[in-house]
Each structure stands twice: as structure tokens, then as C-alpha cells.
């Protein structure tokens, strides 16, 4: 049987981020485990400037236009060498939808199989609002041959809006072979890993931490790991006595080391898709506290973590106190078993392959 030929349109690190890390992990897995069956190339869509470096609206519009031109040019070159079995497109919405539109139109005209992999959690809101972003998303969904939803709510929404016949629920995945062995002994550390920006709930996290009584928190440390702007963290007026450390950006393996030795991982985001950081914490047996957005409630169901309302300081504080004062090992143990049964990369990739093999493009 001939090799499957796949073109991925997705970001690669650096900078490190959920979709970029997924693409890097998937490419390593295919190269090592599926090299005899799959040939692939990647058109890198990673931004040249970080979120924390002050990308204003004009810069994002210009950057989006440049990405559209660059991606279209590279895709035409790839297609000039022969049609692939599938083009797998990841999307995080917003201005990137314009690039997706150009790509999907090109593939539709050439009758090339496509997988449109939705990696953000605002689909229901956008399709109901039907604003410029919602209209673009709807247009792209019509053009796509196959659509991947990474959470149950998004899949349900796609079905309600008439895309159910070509939509599939496929969760994110993790390669357990690439992770360190889960640490049995956890330190009195609670970690955040991600972009240090307001939308990740950093303000609520710092406020909740400061409201915990010193008697409870004095032996504990909050580590906030990820790229940040000094101007932003200066607004929190952190004191040494607060036991809060802004670590900055770390290489992925170093961040995993911090996560592995932490008693808990916290992600109080306003919006998420299917966060890799939560998946990694679960796979390391680290208790997760995260907001009720995107796929998180589904991931942490069945006692696999603690779910709090987004932007709710009181619930976040109570969850932090629970971690500090109770035996929480059961959360991590159950989460690890769930990862093994539902999210291990070999199982998820087989679902991708079934979509890549589909050739009934209209």
C-alpha cells in the first residue's frame, strides 16, 4: 500500500503553545512509529511575535495578511509536487480564519480532502452571534471536507448548525513515552504554565492566592511559568511574603519537570479549547484546578480534577485551599488512568488516519 501523503497547516515552536506543541509531538510520533505508512510535510503558521510582546490590532491584521499570502504560496508549491491524500488544517479562530478561507477554497476547487481541526472553544458563541468572525467560520465549515471538534459541546454545536454529517469528536492526545515518570513525591508547589496574560485568569489567580490566610499558604509556593511582560506583572505589586514566583518561559521539557514536582496545576482561563497543559498534568498524576471552559469539564469529569467557574475568585481560592489542606492524590491517580484509556497518542492518531483516508470529496 502506498504511503499516505499528508500536508499539515499548523504552527511549530517556537514560540511554545498548545497547538505548536501538539504539531511537534505528532510529527515526532509519525516519524518514529508511522514512517512506513505516512509521508508528511508541515506549513508552519506560527506568529513571528508573541502575544506578550504587545501585538496591537494593526500588527495582527498585517501579520494575518502576511500569513495568508505565505501559507497560500507554500501550499501551491506543495500541491505542484502532486496532490496529497489530505491537508490537515488547525485553526484557533480570529484573524486566522481569513487564511483558513483561502486554503479551504483552494482545496475545494481542486477536490482535495481536507480536515479542519478546530482548536478553540468559542464556536457556539460565534455561530450564534453571526458577526464577521462567525460568518467566516461558517463559510469555512461549509468548505471543509471533514471537521474535527475537540470537545463534546463544539461537536454538539456543529451538529445543530447542520455540519453533523462531516463532523467528528476527536480529543487531543499525548505521547506518554515522551513524558517523565510520574513523581510519587510532590512538593508544596502549585504551578501555572501558559501565556501570562489577562485572558488566562492571571489576575484572578494572584488575587485568590493573596486572599488565602498566611497560616495555610506560608509553606506553599505559586509558580507562574510562561512568557510575560514586566509591565503586566508589575501591576500585581507582588511582595516576597506572597510566595509567588514569575518564572518566565522555559523549554518544554523543563516546564514538564516543574509540573511533575508540583502538587497541583492551575489554569483559570477565560477560554480554552482542549489544553495540552491540562493533559500533561493529568498524565503526570498532578492534580488539576481549571476553569469550566472548552473541553476542560469533560477532561476532568469522573473525579479527575477540580473545575471552577471562570473569573470566579472565590471558587478558585476554595480550590487552592483544598489542595493545600486535604489529601488530593486521588485526583491525579484517576486522571492518569483516564489519559491512558482515552487520550494516548496511538489511539487518537488512528482516528486521524481514518479521516485522512477519506476521499469522497464533493
Sequence positions of predicted segments:
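Conserved donor-binding/catalytic core segment of Leloir-type glycosyltransferases
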Residues: 7-8, 174, 182-200, 205-210, ...
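Glycosyltransferase donor-sugar binding loop
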Residues: 42-48, 193, 206, 221-233, ...
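Donor nucleotide-sugar binding/catalytic pocket of nucleotide-sugar-dependent glycosyltransferases
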Residues: 137-179
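Nucleotide-activated donor-binding/catalytic signature segment of Leloir-type glycosyltransferases, i.e.
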Residues: 233-250
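Aromatic "clamp/platform" in nucleotide-sugar-dependent glycosyltransferases that forms part
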Residues: 270
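Conserved acidic donor-binding segment of nucleotide-sugar-dependent glycosyltransferases
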Residues: 302, 306-313, 322-327
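A short, well-ordered alpha-helix in the C-terminal region of glycosyltransferases
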Residues: 329-342
Amino acid at each position: 500500500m502506498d504511503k499516505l501523503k499528508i500536508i499539515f497547516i499548523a504552527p511549530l515552536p517556537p514560540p511554545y503553545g498548545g497547538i505548536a506543541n501538539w504539531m511537534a509531538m505528532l510529527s515526532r510520533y509519525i516519524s518514529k512509529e508511522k514512517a512506513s505508512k505516512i509521508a508528511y510535510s508541515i506549513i508552519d503558521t506560527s506568529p513571528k511575535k508573541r502575544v506578550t510582546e504587545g501585538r496591537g490590532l494593526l500588527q495582527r491584521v498585517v501579520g494575518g495578511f502576511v500569513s495568508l499570502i505565505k501559507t497560500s504560496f507554500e501550499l501551491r508549491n506543495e500541491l505542484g509536487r502532486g496532490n496529497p491524500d489530505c491537508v490537515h488544517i488547525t485553526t484557533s479562530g480570529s484573524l486566522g480564519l481569513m487564511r483558513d478561507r483561502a486554503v479551504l477554497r483552494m482545496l475545494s476547487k481542486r477536490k482535495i480532502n481536507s480536515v479542519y481541526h478546530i482548536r478553540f472553544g468559542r464556536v457556539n458563541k460565534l455561530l450564534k452571534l453571526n458577526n464577521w468572525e462567525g460568518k467566516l467560520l461558517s463559510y469555512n465549515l461549509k468548505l471543509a471536507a471533514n471537521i474535527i471538534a475537540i470537545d463534546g459541546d463544539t461537536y454538539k454545536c456543529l451538529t445543530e448548525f447542520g455540519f453533523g454529517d462531516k463532523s467528528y469528536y476527536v480529543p487531543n492526545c499525548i505521547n506518554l513515552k515522551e513524558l517523565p515518570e510520574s513523581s510519587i513525591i510532590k512538593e508544596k508547589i502549585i504551578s501555572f504554565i501558559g501565556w501570562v496574560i489577562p485572558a488566562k485568569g492571571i489576575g484572578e489567580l494572584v488575587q485568590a492566592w493573596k486572599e488565602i490566610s498566611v497560616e495555610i499558604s506560608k509553606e506553599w509556593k505559586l509558580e507562574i511559568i510562561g512568557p510575560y511582560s514586566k509591565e503586566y506583572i508589575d501591576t500585581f505589586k507582588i511582595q516576597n511574603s506572597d510566595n509567588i514566583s514569575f518564572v518566565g518561559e522555559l523549554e518544554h521539557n523543563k516546564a514538564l519537570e516543574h509540573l511533575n514536582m508540583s502538587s497541583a496545576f492551575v489554569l483559570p482561563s477565560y477560554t480554552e479549547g482542549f489544553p495540552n497543559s491540562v493533559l500533561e498534568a493529568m498524565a503526570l498524576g498532578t492534580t488539576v484546578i481549571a476553569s469550566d471552559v472548552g473541553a476542560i469539564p469533560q477532561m476532568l469529569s469522573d473525579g479527575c480534577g477540580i473545575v471552577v467557574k471562570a473569573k470566579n475568585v472565590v471558587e478558585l481560592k476554595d480550590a487552592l485551599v483544598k489542595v493545600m489542606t486535604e489529601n488530593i492524590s486521588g485526583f491525579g491517580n484517576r486522571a492518569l488512568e483516564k489519559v491512558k484509556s482515552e487520550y494516548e497518542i496511538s489511539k487518537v492518531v488512528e482516528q486521524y488516519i481514518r479521516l485522512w483516508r477519506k476521499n469522497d470529496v464533493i
